[in-house]
Amino acid sequence: MKPPPPTRREVVADTLHGVTVADPYRWLEDGDDPEVQQWVADQNRYTRQALDARPDRDAWHERLVALMGLPVVMSAVVRGDRVFTAERLAGADQYVLALRSLDAIASQDSSPAVLFDPALGAADAAVAIDWFEPSPDGTMVALGVSEGGTENSTLQVLVVGPDAGVTVLDDRIPNTRACSVAWEPDGSGFLYTRYPEGDEYHRTVFAHRLGDDPAGDPVVWAEHVTAETWPSVDLSPDGRWVLVHAMVGWSRYDVHVLDRRAPDAGWRDVIAGVEVMSTFSFDAAGTGLIGTTTLDAPKGRVVALPLDGATDPADWTTIVPERDRVLGALTVAGDELLVVATSNAVDSVERWSPDGTLLGAIGDPSGIGVASVVSMSADRTTGRGVIVTVGFDAPFRLWPFSPSSAPESGRHDGKTAGIPPLAVSQVTFPSLDGTTIGMFLIHRADVEPGLDTPTILNGYGGFAIAETPVWSPTIAAWCEQGGLYAIAGLRGGIEHGEEWHDAGRRANKQNVFDDFHAAADWLVATGRTSRERLAIDGRSNGGLLVGAALTQRPDLCAAVSCGVPLLDMIRFPQFLIARLWTDEYGDPDIADEFAWVHAYSPYHHVVEGTAYPATFLWTAEGDTRVDPLHARKMAALLQEASGSIGDRPVLLHQEGRAGHGVGKPVSKKADEQADVMAFFTWQLGIS
């Protein structure tokens, strides 16, 4: 193919902690610069000419549209018999807020009533629901809406009648990105989190009464440890106690309580200043806290404590001790506790009594299968609720449940659009330092992977996010066509507890890259694929992962998909919300931590003349998490360094009216992934 569009190179360098750091494409950082916008247009045109010419792109797009058009339930919140869901209806571009009943779900008759559709009255499909929170009695819902993938929500309030009729109130509160909402028991208002105008940090808890001007809402909590402190808020069922979890970095939650009957006493620390993760809910009576903590238990334990008593962790009562499973979300369901327990990257839901007796598990005799729990909610009084799970072969499953004294109800499965049977297995292999790493292998059941099998290796490895089973139209489509899809459970995630996370963050980040390299090497060494048939794929922190892989091991694979990536690890904290991530990666302003990130920063390890794998970088102009400048700068540098050697192109696509991924309409997702699939089949020599 012809050479990429030319890119102006400048002599720009900084001296940081005694090290000279070159940055020849810094001018590409300013996305509002007309020259940069023209450069992006030229790059997009070059990429479109290459990918639109691929003979299989239209077929990929058609199948992805069909798979992405399947109904999907993303989350469910129970209030009495009402179940509020964020779900995408068949063929829809965006998620809607819908209403079901527990009885209807249990009887498999669960066609939802749509309460709010962001597409109605919208100019295009880029208007999305970001989050929602129903009131305790289920008659009102606060929800956040944003445009263009920005996730910069404006809070709105719906009143939901007995017949599911909806009235939209006049209340509008901007700057409520990823908002935490705690309704007053009587529904007169709520506590919520909001950002100062024009500020990406200093998230603060306010109180709002319906009908009031939010500009006058009083501050409830603003005791930030740092500007990046991330509070969430909850209220006890009687409204007496305010509970704030303040995330400080990615391995610490400080927890505080306030007694509204004695406000002069001020906030009391439940736990603070300790590098542990503790998340609490109010118990069934509303007089105590119950939750999970990694204090003295890296895999987690369930503890309880009274609200009006001592909060010394030494006095906490352990209900579920640390075991070989990683404990995650906890839900109070009447007289029971539901706890998500993860073993070898597969979730189960355990039922416990408050005295620490294991009562059983949710699901069929085999549990919920090879699946992930994406949502779990119950009515605090009746104990009835619903769990939402996903799997490699299931867009969603709804599992209604009742207290253990009542009979179990069946599950409600999402449709699968004729996907052939898939074989899912888990394997292990040693990393560079001998650590055992796990990996999912997914392929069509009648396929035996071999040297000619086109294979995609995906990973993430960061922010205590576990690589558990997912529903992915891309995986389903790839496997349908005879491909192998591998997902590596790298250090930096939470697959095996907080110690696993710590082993892949800050000074230990290179472990993540070593794990990923070892996964690729294992796939080749065991004959499941070959270098020529291997592609690697990652997005966001996973984009950093594959960026490090292509610069550290250019021999690793034939093709790379690098989506919405972090790649300049020296300047990353200067843009958007990225200072939130210095606790995970390190802060380049600190000499020792600069050394950590400079050692692997992909943008700073591109070597001229190296035959890098074919690389497709894709990003979006509305991304408010990872600035698209990373992909722009890396594309320019790779194109210049390798000259898009031979048949190994370096392509860049920057999507308009889209963001990091949340709120991206199906039409844009199908375009994005059809591009990736067509790029891979081209570079793996199978189209």
Pin down the residues of each PLM region.
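A flexible loop/linker signature enriched in serine peptidases of the S9 family
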Residues: 88-95, 121-126, 145-154, 173-177, ...
